[in-house]
């Protein structure tokens, strides 16, 4: 629910702000460090967590304007989960609500050796950015896709020219992706030799 109120905290924090965009109160935080959940409030300003702790606001306080307040109702509050093996098309389903519904806020795409079949993956990523996406995205380039783009496909034999082309494409793509993914049980990746994989790994 949305509320607009003016409060002044009984403890000193956030001296540089006069407005709190979101205040989550009365929750139990699991921070991922391994320690037990602890009672706390969370203060968010301009989409950033700026304070974690008990704010101890009172009805007579008035310093900060709170735009939105959520009662945690003694429920658990956790960081967003990272899905290390995801599949999806953000150009078709940019909201990614299926991930958000499970608490996932970061996904990885380009798994199993398959990424969008475009020579310049950065342009595809620009399209995703322009369209907007509901989660954070860590993008990988697929080994099988590189084989197809280089004209190697399912072949067991690779000449120097095509191998060089694949390595050049990988080298360029790694400038803006998180790495190379493989799917060696799928075509065309299952046709790769150990020597090919070693050369790719060197990049």
What spans do the regions from the language model cover?
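Histidine-rich, glycine-flanked metal-binding segment
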Residues: 13-22, 29-79
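Active-site metal-binding loops of divalent metal-dependent hydrolases
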Residues: 27, 86
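Active-site-proximal loop/hinge segments that shape catalytic or ion-binding/gating pockets
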Residues: 193
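Divalent-metal coordination cores built from histidine and acidic residues
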Residues: 72-77, 81, 88, 92-182, ...
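Flexible loop residues that form catalytic
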Residues: 32, 112, 185
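Glycine- and other small-residue-rich loops at beta-strand/loop junctions that grip anionic moieties
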Residues: 189
């Amino acid at each position: 629910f949305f509320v607009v109120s003016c409060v002044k905290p009984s403890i000193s924090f956030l001296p540089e702000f006069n407005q709190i965009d979101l205040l989550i109160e009365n929750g139990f935080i699991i921070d991922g460090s391994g320690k037990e959940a602890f009672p706390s409030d969370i203060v968010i300003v301009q989409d950033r967590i700026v304070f974690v702790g008990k704010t101890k606001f009172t009805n007579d306080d008035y310093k900060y304007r709170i735009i939105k307040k959520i009662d945690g109702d003694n429920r658990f509050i956790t960081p967003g989960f990272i899905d290390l093996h995801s599949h999806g098309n953000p150009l078709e389903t940019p909201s990614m609500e299926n991930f958000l519904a499970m608490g996932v806020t970061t996904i990885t795409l380009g798994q199993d050796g398959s990424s969008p079949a475009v020579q310049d993956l950065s342009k595809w990523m620009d399209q995703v950015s322009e369209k907007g996406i509901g989660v954070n995205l860590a993008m990988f380039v697929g080994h099988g896709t590189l084989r197809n783009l280089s004209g190697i496909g399912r072949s067991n034999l690779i000449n120097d020219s095509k191998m060089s082309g694949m390595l050049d494409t990988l080298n360029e793509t790694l400038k803006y992706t998180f790495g190379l993914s493989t799917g060696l049980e799928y075509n065309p990746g299952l046709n790769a030799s150990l020597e090919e994989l070693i050369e790719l790994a060197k990049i």
